[in-house]
Amino acid sequence: MKKLITLILIGVLFMSCSKEKDVAVISTQFGDMVVEFYPEIAPMHVESFTILAKEGYFDGTTFHRVMPGFVIQGGDPNSKDTNRLNDGSGGRAGKFFGIGRENDPDTWMIPGEFNDKLHVKGTLSMARTPDPDGASSQFFVCNASRPDLDGQYTVFGQVIKGLEVIDQIINVNTPRRENRGYQGPDVDNPFEKVEMTVKIMKHSEAMKG
């Protein structure tokens, strides 16, 4: 009987561990943000982000658009180079979702998965072109509530640990902060790069410490 109970407990523990959700850990020089996903409402966006993160696609990219009261935006591979002016113009989906040329990954985009989740502080949402089905790898995290974004961009996650990191990032120096009249394409791009790495791990592991 004791052996049976032990086996049952082991089985329950195994099932519990196997069902544990994955989260993303976005690490910067200011600390880590732990993000939970919403696969039930934005499955393609979660899948694409997860694929790219596991590939190391985001590692070394930056938050190239930092706007207090709005968002911090990143995920563009162009931000890995030394040209500040091309940041925000690159990216691709993690796999072929039916948009773009299947044999050309650089053209892959994600169809819109607009939902009822609100854009509040810590919301993880996907940037896109003017095309509703024009999301790639670029994402943003809200640093304030932005109801004007609700239903216009796909929310696919939420920061559950590390909100203070957002507060530190939005206080970095940018061309706009130094010169309100500046209108270059890098107007909100920090002078000192805010680089990131993104790892996918189990919730319990990410929440340690």
What are the language-model segments listed below?
Residues L4-F14:
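Sec-dependent N-terminal signal peptides
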Residues M15-G209:
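Cyclophilin-like peptidyl-prolyl cis-trans isomerases
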